[in-house]
């Protein structure tokens, strides 16, 4: 079982329509970059048994 410690959404206004979501769990952290609601890159790390759907201008849902 993965315990999520914190979730942050970081909006980078210097890059048009690009947003970042950061998830911290017990042993790891991950940063996922989105542009126009499409996932385009991911940093080192892992998320176990999860799927992320993000609309950075409205809200986000995490489905585990």
Swiss-Prot record:
This is Putative uncharacterized protein DDB_G0271918. It comes from the Eukaryota.
């Amino acid at each position: 079982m993965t315990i999520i410690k914190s979730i942050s959404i970081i909006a980078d206004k210097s890059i048009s329509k690009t947003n970042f979501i950061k998830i911290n769990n017990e042993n790891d952290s991950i940063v996922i970059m989105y542009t126009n609601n499409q996932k385009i890159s991911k940093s080192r790390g892992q998320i176990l048994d999860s799927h992320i759907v993000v609309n950075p201008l409205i809200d986000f849902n995490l489905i585990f």
